[in-house]
Amino acid sequence: MPKKRKTRGKKHSAKQKEEEVNSVVSPGIAKNDEGAGNDEGAYQVNRYTNEPVQPFFGALDPEEEKYFQQAEQAFANHFTRENEDTRFFVDSIYREVQGKELIVCNNVFGSKVLEKLFPLSTSRQIKSFFSALNGHYVELIQTTFGSYAFEKLLSHMAAILNLETQGVTEDQDDVLEGENENVFMTAETLLMYMYNEIRPEVSMLMSHKLAVHVLGKIFLLLDGYRFVYHDGNRTTMESISVPESFPQFAYSIIDSATDNLDTPELRAYCVDKYASQIMRAFIRIDFERSKKTKKKHDPRLVSKLLLSNEYDLKELPFMETLLKDETGSRILEVIVENMSASHLLRFYAVFEGRFYRLCVHPIANFIMQRYIRRLGRKEIGSVIDELKKNTDNIIRKSFLPVLRTLLEKSNHLHCYQDDIFSMIQTSVTNSGKDANIIPCLLRSKHKRDKANPENKERKLVNNLLGAQLLEEMLHCEKQHIQLLLDSVLDLSKEQILEYCLETVSSHLIEGILDLSDLNPVFLKKFLNILSGSFATLAVSAPGSHIVDKAWKATRALPLYRTRIVRELAEGGDDVKFDFYGKKVCSNWKVELFRRAPDEWYRFMKQDEPSKRVHERARQYGRIVSGSSANTQPLGEKRSTENDEELESGPKRVKV
């Protein structure tokens, strides 16, 4: 047998090292040989991209794919509401999908069509489609497009389950030709089929990149929570009614994880990028279970992780990991939000002396917000006393959300508002920039529009966190609100117009105009500043809301209302035919003012308050009682007794 040829050099030595490394495959990457990935309870991983290998269900024909591409465009352009045409279109799509549900779910165009199809479907159609996936739930949630389509389907199945649990009968819809017989099953039965199929694979799916998003929502559905999807990828979670067997199923999985996994393994899951989402669901469900029991005790899972009395939280390294880790901090947020009040003092011992450093930390500040919402009056005072020592940098960008939460809690408890305002004013004064509190907190800057690089004009950009803090200041006492109003009047007209036309800062102006007891002197000065610019504001998205708020704010100022509506009428077609301007014209009845001003004045009179302007001014000390003959409200009649006293002669009696 010939000897193996010897080789040397950097090229061959590097190749030899690579072969040695490949011979020892890491646990997260499947070895690429025969039988790799065929073990039960494991999924295949691409050795080159380190991404999970997705199951393959088949592919659509070019004609079928073109059909779903056209169906997606039809949904966007025409079939957006419930009507007869939409019903026929939905039924035709279900006939096309029948028999190839898995393939359509995992297609880029088919999944988008399904996401728009489910909200317009009947309960029978939803259950028929869901039952067609039976036996393939585990594989489907491991695919890119199928996982998103299944999330939407699960949300609609939860809505059907809620109705069936409450005893609401579904409409007797016509069964489509060839429709699955499982449509006559209840949503509870169909969902239990899915749970029983997924349960043996939970440990494998917890670390799957695509499956964890669906798996977390599945566990929360067991506990009675449904995710509602809105436009713009926004989701909200609402409580629903579920059968009694659902929470017990979730409790059994959590108890199994608590008993079979030791503490280091559970903590490793908490800081894992994907498994932490499932751990958050487990912790939330475990807290819900403990609240339902008569004997209040800490959940077993959370006690094993962190809250056991055996642990010294101040010296526990895992506590520091949760505070500073981007993934683990979300776990700690759920714990702080739901833990019993007896643990607040233990956490206070951990945070004492570190409040400022944790509040300005880019990750720990989210935990501090949750913690501050749980504190009482005494603890809030201790936090503020510690923060007073660092008032120079208290308006830092990373500190603004904590400052807003602190002010919100102070408004709720009606305490320490003066201290917070004094800290903010001191920090603004020491910043060395503009002494006005509004531009300082908004961190106003002029930047070029990235969406339109050719446009060299710079647009105003404001900080959202600072705007939220300023909006929270509007819920404080009158003397604090007056400081904010004075800061608005100190701005130039150009600055105020820029703030009105910018999306973030316009909400602050709306909040000011929406105040129930707004100072009439400030309102007149502010409207005088905006005079001549209402037509410009009406044709912009942020400014149109401000013009609409001005209608309510000027209820007691008919002269200012007339000026504004006249200015809108003089705007002509530029305002009338603009997308936002026509809505403003409709709210202000501009067309009625053009055609029949007398009728518009009568319409305005109907909206006038019973309390007159000078009565509101008297509340602010502007008019002294008895200093003028006009202090008497116009709506009241003179007293007859006073008239009799003023008469010089006796009454004439008719005989």
Swiss-Prot record:
GO terms for biological process: endonucleolytic cleavage in 5'-ETS of tricistronic rRNA transcript (SSU-rRNA, 5.8S rRNA, LSU-rRNA); endonucleolytic cleavage in ITS1 to separate SSU-rRNA from 5.8S rRNA and LSU-rRNA from tricistronic rRNA transcript (SSU-rRNA, 5.8S rRNA, LSU-rRNA); endonucleolytic cleavage to generate mature 5'-end of SSU-rRNA from (SSU-rRNA, 5.8S rRNA, LSU-rRNA); ribosomal small subunit export from nucleus. GO terms for cellular component: 90S preribosome; nucleolus; nucleus; preribosome, small subunit precursor. SUPFAM superfamilies: ARM repeat. Coiled coil: none annotated. It is found in: Nucleus, Nucleolus. The keyword rRNA processing applies. The keyword Transmembrane does not apply. SMART domains: Pumilio. GO terms for molecular function: RNA binding. Pumilio repeats lie at residues 96-131, 132-170, 260-303, 314-348, 349-385, 490-528, 529-566. Residues 1-14 have a biased composition (Basic residues). Residues 1-41, 612-655 are annotated as: Disordered. Its main location: nucleus. RNA-binding nucleolar protein required for pre-rRNA processing. Involved in production of 18S rRNA and assembly of small ribosomal subunit. PANTHER family: NUCLEOLAR PROTEIN 9. Belongs to the NOP9 family. This is Nucleolar protein 9. It comes from Schizosaccharomyces pombe (strain 972 / ATCC 24843) (Fission yeast). The gene is nop9.
